[in-house]
């Protein structure tokens, strides 16, 4: 099992990172790496200056794989799943084989009901993705790729659904409907 913390970056030219702590459980020291891709092959390269003020971490390593507005991440077994809001995609990275695939892409989906992808969680292999805007839904992506609305909230301009989570026994879903400033 890979002992790493995976991080997204919420900018249009963002990267995908992994942090390998020197001592597992202590995040005060370790190595920050960025995903790179050349000729289809993925690799992890150490970021020279993890403080990353100038230049930012995403611009320090050649061939950094770009992700358009990284958002939520969740572990599904030993795989890492995350969303990118700029292109409405859901990604899945498998550390054991160092492979990456797109689980959902609104631009090519036969059922593009999910837009404004944001937070993601999972239960029993199903992915649950919150929409930041879109139709104000939490959308379920089943292991076979089927996409369907799981929750529909009433739409209020400027609102978003966020923070989807399940109770430890999986019988209750929780989420937050963030309202625009001034709404009650």
Name what the model sees in each region.
Residues 1-184:
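Sequence/structural signature of beta-propeller domains
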């Amino acid at each position: 099992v890979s002992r790493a913390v995976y991080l997204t970056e919420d900018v249009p030219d963002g990267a995908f990172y992994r942090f390998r702590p020197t001592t597992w459980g202590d995040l005060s020291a370790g190595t920050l790496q960025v995903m790179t891709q050349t000729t289809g092959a993925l690799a992890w390269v150490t970021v020279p200056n993890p403080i990353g003020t100038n230049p930012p971490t995403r611009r320090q390593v050649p061939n950094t794989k770009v992700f358009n507005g990284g958002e939520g991440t969740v572990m599904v077994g030993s795989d890492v799943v995350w969303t990118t809001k700029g292109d409405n995609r859901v990604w899945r990275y498998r550390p054991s084989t160092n492979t990456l695939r797109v689980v959902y892409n609104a631009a090519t989906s036969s059922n593009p009901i999910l837009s404004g992808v944001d937070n993601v969680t999972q239960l029993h292999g199903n992915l649950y993705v919150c929409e930041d805007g879109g139709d104000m839904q939490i959308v379920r992506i089943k292991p076979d790729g089927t996409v369907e609305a799981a929750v529909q909230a009433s739409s209020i301009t400027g609102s978003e659904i966020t923070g989807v989570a399940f109770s430890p026994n999986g019988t209750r879903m929780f989420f937050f409907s963030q309202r625009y400033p001034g709404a009650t």
